[in-house]
Amino acid sequence: RGGRHYLLTSGMTGYRPNPSEAAVSDDPLRGYTVLGDLSEGDPSNTTFHSQPTCVIEVNGRFLYLGDRWMPELNEWSYTGDPRPDPATQKKIMEKLKELGLDPVRDREEAMKVAIHMSEACNTSLADYVFLPLEWEGGRPVLRWKSEWRL
């Protein structure tokens, strides 16, 4: 974009995405400058629980595509509904009870457990995140949108 090269990265631990980062370079052979996390409003800093796959340009706009290996534990965090689907909610509550955590009192830790429950993962159900990549002062930014148009 604008003659600059952007790099969107993350890692994985099991099937859980790790924090993501964006970097920029005028010349990729001379290295990149890290810009930090690109997802705004994502407490996990993991591009909304996805791993960057690619960015494509469509009609002058850039679209972020990310793999999401654990959709059953992720989507509910960004829809405004504070609860996952009933089956997932039951699995999470069982795990919290096993760990001696109260979902209200230990909310932050409970969210971490819910997000990181690899044993609830069925990767054949993996899905994707498609979001418009926005720009603020030469910096790529992702914001969760339940619905959007080109």
Predicted features along the sequence, with ranges:
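Carbohydrate-active catalytic/glycan-binding domains of CAZyme proteins
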Residues: 1-150
